[in-house]
Amino acid sequence: MKIGVVGLGLIGGSIFKALEALNYDVIGVSDSQNGLQENISNDFNNLKDCEMVFVATPMNKTLDVLQKLEEYLPKSTIVADTCSLKEFVSNKNYKYNFIPTHPMAGTEFKGFEHSFKELFEGAKWVVCNRGLAQEKNNSLA
């Protein structure tokens, strides 16, 4: 399974590192970490073959990223955000399968350099329901 992560700060970086440790094919998209590794760039086109994409950008950029992803992803792609607020991202219909989520994890630090693969171990992860049509996607998430 190919999984994308947009935004490689503490949360996105930790998702990225955890998935890599589990041997998933992971693609990172980040302006600040562009080129850090072979599988990290700032090119959204690299996400087009992903079955799932996590959006872990700062809240003020999340809606723009979710809209931009519509240009690159097929409608079968599952996209999950990690914002702590849900209404502003949930009130829109997207071309792909969107699941609003919120990981209940973090530290006092920010940035990829402070991310670590164990951040979510033992943590709760809230998955918000957007209706019965989303049940299949929620089970995949």
Regions found by a protein language model. Name each.
Residues 27-29, 80, 99, 126:
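Hydrophobic/aromatic beta-strand patches that form the interior of the parallel beta-sheet core
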Residues 33-37, 88-89, 134-136:
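Short, charged/polar "capping" segments at the starts of alpha-helices
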Residues 44-73, 78:
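Rossmann-like NAD(P)-binding element
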Residues 56-58, 83, 129:
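Glycine-rich, N-terminal phosphate-binding loop of Rossmann-like dinucleotide-binding domains
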Residues 64-113:
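Rossmann-like NAD(P)(H) cofactor-binding subdomain of soluble oxidoreductases
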